[in-house]
């Protein structure tokens, strides 16, 4: 479920982006809705609201959520400040590649792979399976970053659509594939190994 919370601001961004540009009165102020810049403002505000609500309810945010929020604030603010959507186009590639870097780093730093730190409380798997799973996430994030970058700078007319629905589609497909893979290997785990409950 956590993976899909990140898409709430993106969906709002998409809706505002698709609105035909218009000027509306908001609390006595004229505000332009529609297009990339008002959509970017909505993305920033909705991200602050969503992650702020999560922080209040959970008393913390995951590191991945902090990264997503900070990237949204930085790239979104640069987009508005310089009136250039180029900055926003780089957000998804940079975030995905930073995630990939974190998973890569866990092969060399720490006593457990990152995917095992994330999912180890719920699953008991042989170490080779954890390794393959971690590598799969690295490949996924590298591919998502490259795909977002390619579409953003090659297909101007559809990059926002891809940013939202392409990313969501790739995430769903990957999670389904991961589930199928895990279902084949859960029985390989040592049944005597205790599993920590939530």
Swiss-Prot record:
<keyword id="KW-1003">Cell membrane</keyword>
<keyword id="KW-0997">Cell inner membrane</keyword>
<comment type="similarity">
    <text>Belongs to the YciB family.</text>
</comment>
<comment type="function">
    <text>Plays a role in cell envelope biogenesis, maintenance of cell envelope integrity and membrane homeostasis.</text>
</comment>
<feature type="transmembrane region" description="Helical">
    <location>
        <begin position="4"/>
        <end position="24"/>
    </location>
</feature>
<keyword id="KW-1133">Transmembrane helix</keyword>
<dbReference type="InterPro" id="IPR006008">
    <property type="entry name" value="YciB"/>
</dbReference>
<feature type="transmembrane region" description="Helical">
    <location>
        <begin position="90"/>
        <end position="110"/>
    </location>
</feature>
<keyword id="KW-0812">Transmembrane</keyword>
<feature type="transmembrane region" description="Helical">
    <location>
        <begin position="67"/>
        <end position="87"/>
    </location>
</feature>
<feature type="transmembrane region" description="Helical">
    <location>
        <begin position="36"/>
        <end position="56"/>
    </location>
</feature>
<feature type="transmembrane region" description="Helical">
    <location>
        <begin position="162"/>
        <end position="182"/>
    </location>
</feature>
<feature type="transmembrane region" description="Helical">
    <location>
        <begin position="135"/>
        <end position="155"/>
    </location>
</feature>
<dbReference type="Pfam" id="PF04279">
    <property type="entry name" value="IspA"/>
</dbReference>
<keyword id="KW-0472">Membrane</keyword>
<protein>
    <recommendedName>
        <fullName>Inner membrane-spanning protein YciB</fullName>
    </recommendedName>
</protein>
<dbReference type="GO" id="GO:0005886">
    <property type="term" value="C:plasma membrane"/>
</dbReference>
């Amino acid at each position: 479920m956590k993976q899909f919370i990140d898409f709430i601001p993106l969906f709002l961004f998409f809706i505002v982006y698709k609105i035909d540009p218009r000027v509306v009165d908001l609390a006595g102020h004229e505000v332009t809705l529609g297009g990339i810049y008002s959509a970017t403002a909505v993305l920033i505000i909705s991200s602050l609201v969503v992650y702020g609500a999560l922080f209040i309810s959970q008393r913390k945010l995951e590191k991945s959520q902090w990264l997503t929020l900070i990237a949204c604030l930085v790239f979104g603010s640069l987009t508005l400040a310089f009136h250039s959507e180029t900055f926003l186009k780089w957000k998804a590639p940079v975030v995905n590649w930073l995630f990939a870097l974190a998973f890569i780093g866990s092969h060399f730093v720490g006593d457990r792979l990152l995917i095992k730190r994330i999912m180890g409380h719920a699953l008991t798997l042989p170490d080779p399976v954890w390794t393959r799973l971690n590598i799969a996430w690295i490949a996924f994030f590298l591919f998502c970053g490259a795909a977002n970058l390619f579409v953003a700078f090659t297909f101007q007319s559809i990059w926002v659509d891809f940013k939202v629905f392409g990313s969501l589609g790739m995430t769903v497909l990957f999670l389904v594939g991961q589930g199928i893979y895990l279902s084949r290997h859960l029985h390989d785990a040592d049944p005597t190994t205790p599993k920590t409950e939530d």
